[in-house]
């Protein structure tokens, strides 16, 4: 079992919360205009590709605007998710007994069987590609989630092409290496209840990196997502209508560590409950993910050993959440000197 994570000290939590509002987009969280990446003039698009590469290399995190996902669809998926969380326990319990690799799961914390640190979080997880899975109730969820999965998968695949180009590769190189035509996709709804003592903070979800390639996230207007940048925890405040994009472990592996999967966490505090909704894509489940030869040609050698994505995901999801412990297991340890 992975070693338990440490609950941040009160001082760390207070600093990270950025209650004075200093952790705003103006502090430097990169912003990527998808419209420019798809339809921009050649010189404008080249600049946007370079900026995207810097965002992946320096942050592993950015916001995307002009993404084409209707606001009405975002509101609909959030409302359907709220409705699911309000269902009687009897109508959800078959999914509450699910194991980490089951296609539909409803639960609390990260994986309550092994959680080392209590996390104030309710979640719905449903695999949506290559096969779509959805709870029967609420009845409207299936149609909404199907459309949402399709829209956000297309968005993430467009970003993947641009990220491939930012590495100096052909736009389809990452897709080819990771078999993204059969990519894995999961939708996740998160509910973080308000604290009983609004003056205190608690962990909604401890520090971790995501197991996949790219994660797309939006929230209900209540802040709480924090990212680690240059050793500091920053409160991520979104631009109106934007998505957060989070680089995951598979991007770090396939780029041989050039692009980093960012550490992030959810902090709960205040009188309002927080909700977020996530769409994550990863390689085809049976693909062995390893550094691209082009990324290991700089003399550094391989930073990671190859691992089948299904095995990596199961390892990360079945153990206590603890920063980058799963990634460290596949990291190659080089001899000094």
From Swiss-Prot:
Tissues in which the UniProt entry reports expression: Expressed in shoots.
EC numbers, comma separated: 1.14.11.-
Dependence of activity on temperature: Optimum temperature is 45 degrees Celsius.
GO cellular component assignments: cytoplasm
PROSITE patterns: FE2OG_OXY
Entries under PANTHER family matching the protein: OXOGLUTARATE/IRON-DEPENDENT DIOXYGENASE
Enzyme class: oxidoreductase
Binding residues for 2-oxoglutarate: 274
Underlying gene: 2ODD19
Organism: Oryza sativa subsp. japonica (Rice)
Keyword Amino-acid biosynthesis: no
Subcellular location: Cytoplasm
Official protein name in the record: 2-oxoglutarate-dependent dioxygenase 19
